[in-house]
């Protein structure tokens, strides 16, 4: 009950969004009942022997959980290039003629979540989305943890083939290790004045302007709760928001 109250306060008073998230690698990840084989449960039982129907059932089960717990959407953590390929995730472009299994998975999630005002985002390798499929996703989140300069970040995220990529792209800093220093300590910002400051990685991300002149869609941290013990609590997130909105306001149109 306390967690439900916290969630309600976060959503209704603070205006926050809480998304369900896990790595999507194999059919049934996180939701296959204990003791049951994923293929038997999702393909044979739920899909009546059809793998694609099993994918639809899996996506709908995720949506059922989101609705049950009053969450705001789903974050597809998609990392086939980082050791997480499987029966759903692979190196193919996600499209009807490429990785059609993920195509159907995303189509099903999008059709359930977005009309209801919920979000569907992809992090990890959103660059594997086809142009048409990217229209079904609200945000592309890149784990830009170890990029050491503004130019290397822009190189990583510059994907004009993705729908509205400038406004929909979010870049994140790694805080399991970098929570004390606002990210890596060997980062070089295109803004010289930031390079003399501690935390120049997260401050650069918060003020990052794309080649068109538009501001990056958003920023984040992996394990934001690690920023809480800093003084003041959430020191780096607060400072990043201040720099991005007040010190270097951006162009969003």
What are these regions (language model features)?
Residues 206, 212-220:
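Cysteine-clustered segments with highest specificity for TGF-beta superfamily mature ligands
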Residues 1-200, 214-216, 225, 229-232, ...:
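Chitinase-like catalytic core of GlcNAc-active glycosidases
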Residues 221-253:
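Extracellular low-complexity, O-glycosylation-prone Ser/Thr/Pro/Gly-rich "stalks"
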